[in-house]
Amino acid sequence: MDAQTAAQHLSKVRDQNPLVHSITNNVVTNFTANGLLALGASPVMAYAIEEAADMAKIAGALVLNIGTLSSASVEAMIAAGKSANENGVPVIFDPVGAGATPFRTASASKIIQEVRLSAIRGNAAEIANIAGAPDWKIKGVDAGEAGGDVVQLAKTAASGLKTVIAITGKTDVISDGADTYAVHNGDKLLTKVTGAGCLLTSVIGAFCAAGQDVLQAAVSAVSVYGSAAQLAALDTSHKGPGSFQIELLNKLASISEQEAAELAAIERVIEK
């Protein structure tokens, strides 16, 4: 897995124009759809339980996001997830806020138990909660000090949940339990845009739809998305998050394979 592989995955997404079915939250639906369109994928958001399963079976990937959940939406997600499983469609899960409330935690757990997930993306606290380590804390204040802990969390969660885990933060860590990568792309302005992480989860879905290897697809998606953010920040750092949000969409559309390869900062984590 290297920079060129990430760039090639971007080309595959644009060539294949995969249909990404995102059952996401109502705060980020529009931004997510526009981000997928900019990247070169085709978004669809079918939330009704009456059609969620039917849409999932014809999609290239299914993305489940519990940001603004309800009992009905959880049931629709599970129905869609089971349909995706039956039809060989990769399922990517974003356990937004897992651990914040009993209902949110139980909903995340139910989805994990009933749907076979290809990948899960979240921040360290969310991943720790769904992995059964809710008291886990990052030791240290920067990526260098905390890196080992995040790597171990990603590996443990991936092995325990039998899926690819992507923990995003200052340094992103992606693992399937056996192989682990750190991605050093992105920009701090991403933290000022609501839905930036949710869009990334759907971008991972697009890359998984276009590639066979889920770990490589997830690493590639995180790197390309972060690289687009870096390019957007260069053009808007003097303006602020509003301009950055729009420019991020522009850069997702315009980033070239060469730029993606040149900017990719992917490191394979080797155990010492």
UniProtKB/Swiss-Prot annotation:
Summarize where substrate binds, as residue positions: 45, 195
Residues bound to ATP: 121, 168
Q: Which UniProt keywords apply?
A: ATP-binding, Kinase, Magnesium, Metal-binding, Nucleotide-binding, Thiamine biosynthesis, Transferase
Catalysed reactions listed for this entry: 5-(2-hydroxyethyl)-4-methylthiazole + ATP = 4-methyl-5-(2-phosphooxyethyl)-thiazole + ADP + H(+)
Its GO biological process annotations read:
thiamine biosynthetic process; thiamine diphosphate biosynthetic process
Which enzyme class, named as a word?
transferase
Pathway where it operates: Cofactor biosynthesis; thiamine diphosphate biosynthesis; 4-methyl-5-(2-phosphoethyl)-thiazole from 5-(2-hydroxyethyl)-4-methylthiazole: step 1/1
> What does this protein need as cofactor?
Mg(2+)
In alphabetical order, the GO MF annotations are: ATP binding; hydroxyethylthiazole kinase activity; magnesium ion binding
Give the E.C. number(s): 2.7.1.50
Family affiliation: Belongs to the Thz kinase family.
Role summary? Catalyzes the phosphorylation of the hydroxyl group of 4-methyl-5-beta-hydroxyethylthiazole (THZ).
* Protein name (record): Hydroxyethylthiazole kinase
- Its source organism is Bacillus velezensis (strain DSM 23117 / BGSC 10A6 / LMG 26770 / FZB42)
According to the entry, what is the taxonomic lineage of the organism?
A: Bacteria, Bacillati, Bacillota, Bacilli, Bacillales
Name the encoding gene, please: thiM
